[in-house]
Design a protein with these regions (language model features):
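Short, charged/polar "capping" segments at the starts of alpha-helices
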Residues: 39-42, 114-115, 162
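Rossmann-like NAD(P)(H) cofactor-binding subdomain of soluble oxidoreductases
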Residues: 57-142
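C-terminal active-site/capping subdomain that shapes the small-molecule cofactor and substrate pocket
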Residues: 235-281
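Residues at the C-termini of beta-strands that transition into short coil/loop
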Residues: 35, 54, 67-69, 108, ...
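Internal alpha-helical scaffold of NAD(P)-dependent oxidoreductase catalytic cores
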Residues: 23, 96-97, 119-125, 138-247, ...
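A structural signal for isolated positions on well-ordered beta-strands in alpha/beta enzyme cores
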Residues: 4, 30-32, 105, 127, ...
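NAD(P)+-binding Rossmann beta1-loop-alpha1 motif at the extreme N-terminus of oxidoreductases
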Residues: 1-56
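Nucleotide donor/acceptor-binding cores
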Residues: 1, 29, 76, 124, ...
Length: 281
């Protein structure tokens, strides 16, 4: 199969890196990185440097790294790992590379990503998905996985279709990715949204890390309040969430390293565009 990872940032670098380490250069699969700028040039020259939480450095060489759709060829699986504000542009780039059998798996933050992709790629099968990882670009060609288990949840809208995508779960797990094909994927996406939207907002507002926010009573109460508000929105939309979703989200935040920052906080601190649109929608 021909697998493309669109966006080789913190998320795409980790999951794309895992896939390329396992499958690139093998007869059965091609793993293609779609990136841009200095990051792309560095990957082309030296491969992607993926740093693990333990400090180990892995060199990842994909089958192809490019920013040109004409070099990509026909794709069977596409993982979208871009920022939300670049989603449609990135999807339009590969419209000539996908077909009716192409499976698209977005790993972005947000609760409307699948719908947005289906508008641009109506002939593809677009699944829903979310991930838990603390990872970011440290420099051109370098991605550092700092924390989080790397857990990936994904699935189709209809639970009756779940077995059609068991092969994708096997493919991801074969690359050492903690992937679970689930029937309640919308609940998983909202659960992630409650977690990441709240932490992104409060850490960016306060200019603090996960650990610093959680140990401050005022910040923690603000975090809890924001989580409860998003929980209420999810329930109003018909989501059946666990009763302890707020407490579990706080526990999840505490499982990350003290110095963890959200991608929105990192972007805000560096003066780059942020994903505030999806966090405050």
């Amino acid at each position: 199969m021909r697998i493309a990872v669109v966006g080789i940032g913190g998320v795409g670098g980790f999951y794309g890196g895992k896939l390329a380490l396992a499958y690139a250069g093998k007869r059965e699969h091609d793993v293609i990185f779609i990136a841009r700028g200095e990051h792309l040039q560095a990957i082309r020259k030296k491969g992607l440097c993926l740093i693990t939480p333990e400090g180990e450095t892995l060199t990842v060489v994909p089958t192809l790294a490019t920013d040109r759709s004409e070099e990509v060829g026909t794709l069977d699986i596409v993982l979208f790992c871009t920022k939300s504000y670049g989603l449609e542009e990135s999807a339009r780039m590969i419209t000539e590379n996908v077909h009716d059998g192409t499976v698209v798996l977005p790993l972005l933050n947000g609760v409307n990503i699948t719908e947005r992709l289906r508008k641009v790629l109506p002939g593809c099968t677009v699944l829903n998905g979310c991930v838990y990882i603390g990872s970011n670009i440290e420099g051109p060609g370098v991605v550092h996985h700092k924390g989080g288990t790397g857990q990936l949840f994904f699935g189709p809208d209809r639970k009756e279709d779940i077995e059609k995508f068991r092969y994708l779960e096997d493919l991801l797990r074969g690359a050492g990715i903690k992937a679970d094909l689930v029937e309640d994927v919308a609940v998983q996406v909202w659960t992630k949204y409650i977690f990441v939207s709240s932490f992104a907002g409060i850490t960016s507002l306060r200019g603090k890390t996960f650990g610093a926010v959680l140990e401050n009573d005022e910040d923690r109460k603000m975090l809890q309040g924001l989580m409860a508000e998003i929980e209420a929105v999810a329930k109003a939309k018909g989501m059946h969430l666990p009763a302890d979703i707020v407490e579990e989200s706080l526990r999840k935040g505490a499982s990350f390293p003290y110095a963890t920052k959200t991608s929105m906080q990192l972007d805000y601190e560096k003066g780059r565009p942020t994903e505030i649109d999806i966090f405050m929608e």
